[in-house]
Amino acid sequence: MRVMAPRALLLLLSGGLALTETWACSHSMRYFDTAVSRPGRGEPRFISVGYVDDTQFVRFDSDAASPRGEPRAPWVEQEGPEYWDRETQKYKRQAQADRVSLRNLRGYYNQSEDGSHTLQRMSGCDLGPDGRLLRGYDQSAYDGKDYIALNEDLRSWTAADTAAQITQRKLEAARAAEQLRAYLEGTCVEWLRRYLENGKETLQRAEPPKTHVTHHPLSDHEATLRCWALGFYPAEITLTWQRDGEDQTQDTELVETRPAGDGTFQKWAAVVVPSGQEQRYTCHMQHEGLQEPLTLSWEPSSQPTIPIMGIVAGLAVLVVLAVLGAVVTAMMCRRKSSGGKGGSCSQAACSNSAQGSDESLITCKA
């Protein structure tokens, strides 16, 4: 049995690793399902993605030409055809179950058949450093709002409203929590251990962040200091700003950790400071890939800062030079045209412009 859920709220076989296996930190496996109804355009679309830690390893899309579970990581591609056939059938059963649930939910909320609605689920397990279940999850959301969730005890449910209480009574009558608990404590943990072993070069690596602090003047009186962490894995990281040793949490702008597109992550934290007091502020960073926490501060550049008015003046000069260049080119064209070579100058100008553009693009790509 498999289960899943949202942020606003998807494996039978033994893992082959002993319970004595240990890791430096905890690990997780999550399945995220989304079913979206689309009245007048066929059956609801169902998409499921699976993650081990921060790495996607499987995907299913009911709208695919040939819907099947698709590997998204090299270490799961080694699973045989029986595995993929079995997983595909589970996805298809889950898709059908979600279609029924969408119809039921529309009735619970007394909604018409005309609108589109969304059902999301997340399920999975966390594995502790001792190789045992740390926590299990099964949560659902409807139209972007929390609906029902399995509690941490893995024995009871929390319903968000009276409609969800209908579902809760059905789940309790079916003793669904017991089945989920067996899955989370057994199958989920066993497969997570297996994936961690098969993909250990990727999943159990720790890449430290590349760090620096940038300075962005806002006015004569204030500036923004931004502390950057780039190219790190896993995604869990802590960034904080301090002023004279005191946390500036309330005054810090902190973005969500973002994927970099190459399997690593990036994040930054920013704080607005009075000009001239930058050295009183320090950025503090903690990550699994660091031997010890880092403390960073802004290092003023040895190059002079160009004031805004200077930049504007420089741009104005460039514009004037560009205009003068165009005038000179036009005059040269007229002279050549008077000598019976009218088209060649225009063609040459286009050719030179194109070559310059190509070189620029090549440089950017490199």
From Swiss-Prot:
Disease / disorder: Psoriasis 1: A common, chronic inflammatory disease of the skin with multifactorial etiology. It is characterized by red, scaly plaques usually found on the scalp, elbows and knees. These lesions are caused by abnormal keratinocyte proliferation and infiltration of inflammatory cells into the dermis and epidermis.
Outcome (variant: residue 319 to A): In allele C*01:02, allele C*02:02, allele C*03:02, allele C*03:04, allele C*04:01, allele C*05:01, allele C*06:02, allele C*08:01, allele C*12:02, allele C*14:02, allele C*15:02 and allele C*16:01
Effect after changing residue 127 to V: In allele C*03:02 and allele C*03:04
Residues bound to a peptide antigen: 87, 94, 101, 183, 195
Protein name, entry field: HLA class I histocompatibility antigen, C alpha chain
Consequence the record notes for mutating residue 30 to K: In allele C*01:02
Primary location class: membrane
Modified residues (Phosphoserine): 357, 360
Subunit details: Heterotrimer that consists of an alpha chain HLA-C, a beta chain B2M and a peptide (peptide-HLA-C-B2M). Early in biogenesis, HLA-C-B2M dimer interacts with the components of the peptide-loading complex composed of TAPBP, TAP1-TAP2, TAPBPL, PDIA3/ERP57 and CALR. Interacts with TAP1-TAP2 transporter via TAPBP; this interaction is obligatory for the loading of peptide epitopes delivered to the endoplasmic reticulum (ER) by TAP1-TAP2 transporter.
Glycosylation sites: 110
Region (Alpha-3): 207-298
UniProt comment concerning the protein's domains: The alpha-1 domain is a structural part of the peptide-binding cleft. The alpha-2 domain is a structural part of the peptide-binding cleft. Mediates the interaction with TAP1-TAP2 complex.
Tissue: Ubiquitous. Highly expressed in fetal extravillous trophoblasts in the decidua basalis (at protein level).
Listed result of changing residue 350 to S: In allele C*01:02, allele C*02:02, allele C*03:02, allele C*03:04, allele C*04:01, allele C*05:01, allele C*06:02, allele C*08:01, allele C*12:02, allele C*14:02, allele C*15:02, allele C*16:01, allele C*17:01 and allele C*18:01
Consequence when changing residue 137 to H: In allele C*15:02
Consequence when changing residue 294 to C: In allele C*17:01; requires 2 nucleotide substitutions
Effect after changing residue 140 to F: In allele C*04:01, allele C*05:01, allele C*07:04, allele C*08:01, allele C*17:01 and allele C*18:01
Outcome when changing residue 363 to A: In allele C*01:02, allele C*02:02, allele C*03:02, allele C*03:04, allele C*04:01, allele C*05:01, allele C*06:02, allele C*08:01, allele C*12:02, allele C*14:02, allele C*15:02, allele C*16:01, allele C*17:01 and allele C*18:01
Effect caused by changing residue 45 to H: In allele C*02:02, allele C*03:02, allele C*03:04 and allele C*15:02
Impact upon substituting residue 180 to Q: In allele C*16:01
Gene, per the UniProt record: HLA-C
A single GO cellular-component term on record: Golgi membrane
Result, substituting residue 97 to T: In allele C*01:02, allele C*02:02, allele C*03:02, allele C*03:04, allele C*05:01, allele C*08:01, allele C*14:02, allele C*15:02 and allele C*16:01
Native species: Homo sapiens (Human)
PANTHER family to which the protein is assigned, alphabetical: HLA CLASS I HISTOCOMPATIBILITY ANTIGEN, C ALPHA CHAIN, MHC CLASS I-RELATED
Subcellular location: Cell membrane; Endoplasmic reticulum membrane
